[in-house]
Structure formats: structure tokens, C-alpha cells
UniProtKB/Swiss-Prot annotation:
It catalyses: N-(5-phospho-beta-D-ribosyl)anthranilate = 1-(2-carboxyphenylamino)-1-deoxy-D-ribulose 5-phosphate. This is N-(5'-phosphoribosyl)anthranilate isomerase. Its EC number is 5.3.1.24. SUPFAM superfamilies: Ribulose-phoshate binding barrel. The gene is trpF. It comes from Streptococcus gordonii (strain Challis / ATCC 35105 / BCRC 15272 / CH1 / DL1 / V288). The lineage of its organism: Bacteria, Bacillati, Bacillota, Bacilli, Lactobacillales. Pfam families: PRAI.
Length: 195
């Protein structure tokens, strides 16, 4: 069954709702964003997460020190990296790594070292999908997440089209730029129940 990651969580109610509804992964954004959480916030929110749900820290072009501090303080299970960074960094992190790519056409230079890959729209967090028809997964050898413009209305189609390891949503479960608890539940239900 396809796994679910709810990303950009910043409140206790959103974390608890996602966990209770059956999310497999929850994401805390440490990069510059309206969804950004401080290390202190992430630590408090992480304490609400049961051991059955994996905590992911989301970073853009991080340093090793940034990653290590967040892993330690927020007890992260995985890190998700966007942007430019030295591939050698992947070997220095003692957590599985999700390497994110903004899909702008044909895939090229896809990491063979990352534990997971994530494919997102050209502008992450925009609520827009990338061109699904142009996506060629023949060179992908790791489990992968699909993100970018997903919501309860299109997630089943995305799963049927890509057969991904997991789907990842942030803006698709928001109303007026805030996490919507009902949309979180509906999204997870659509994935888990195949509705």
C-alpha cells in the first residue's frame, strides 16, 4: 500500500490529526518558508508523534551541522534535502535521506546514493502538479515519493499513474494557508481506502 507523508506541520492539532488518521510520515520544514518551524517547536511537536510514524526534517541546501542539530533536537527519523549540496553529505548523515527534485522536464542526474527520491512541482508548495505524462521512471531505482499539487481529488490518479512508494502533500491539505484537519483526514483516507 502507498505510504502517506503530510508535510509542513507546525501545530499540535495538525500533528495529532495526521498521526491518528494514519499518516506514515510527517514533515517538519526547517527551510525558509511560511511553514518553517524552529528547532524548539519541532522538538515539542516531535514528542507528540508515536513511534509508528516517521518524522522527516525538510531542508534546502543544508550544512552537515544543521542536519545533525535538527536530527538530535527533534529526534528526526529521516531528512529530506532540496537544492544544491555536496553528494558526499549523504554518506555523513546517520539517517535515511530523501533527495528532492523539482521536475521541469526529463529527469537527469538522479542520485544513486539517496535512500529515497521525491519528485515535486517546479515550485514546491505552490499547489501545482508537474507534467505527469513527461515523467519517465525508468532510471529510478529507489523507492520514491510523488509530491506537487496533490490533494484528495487527484491523489488516487497519481497513485495509479506513478505507483509510488509514497505520496506527499502540504498545500493540498490547507485552507487559507493553514493546515485543515478535515482535509488531512480526507487525503489520508483516499490513499489508505483507495477511494
Amino acid at each position: 500500500m502507498t505510504k502517506v507523508k503530510i508535510c509542513g506541520l507546525s501545530t499540535a492539532s495538525a500533528v495529532e490529526t495526521a498521526c491518528q488518521a494514519g499518516a506514515d510520515y510527517i514533515g517538519f520544514v526547517f527551510a525558509e518558508s511560511r511553514r518553517r518551524v524552529s528547532l524548539e517547536q519541532a522538538q515539542k511537536l516531535a514528542a507528540l508523534v508515536p513511534s509508528t510514524v516517521r518524522k522527516v526534517g525538510v531542508f534546502v541546501s543544508p550544512s552537515l551541522a544543521e542536519l545533525q542539530e535538527a536530527i538530535s533536537v527533534a529526534n528526526l527519523d529521516l531528512v529530506q534535502i532540496h537544492g544544491d549540496f555536496d553528494e558526499e553529505l549523504l554518506t555523513q548523515i546517520d539517517r535515511p535521506v530523501i533527495q528532492a527534485y523539482q521536475v521541469k522536464g526529463a529527469l537527469k542526474d538522479v542520485s544513486q546514493q539517496a535512500d529515497y527520491l521525491l519528485f515535486d512541482a517546479p515550485l514546491a508548495g505552490s499547489g501545482r502538479t508537474f507534467d505527469w505524462q513527461a515523467f519517465d521512471k525508468s532510471q529510478i531505482h529507489q523507492p520514491f515519493f510523488i509530491a506537487g499539487g496533490l490533494n484528495a481529488g487527484n491523489v488516487r490518479e497519481a497513485i495509479q499513474h506513478f505507483a509510488p512508494y509514497a505520496v506527499d502533500v502540504s498545500s493540498g491539505v490547507e485552507t487559507d494557508a493553514q493546515k485543515d484537519l478535515e482535509k488531512i483526514k480526507e487525503f489520508i483516507e483516499r490513499v489508505k481506502d483507495g477511494i
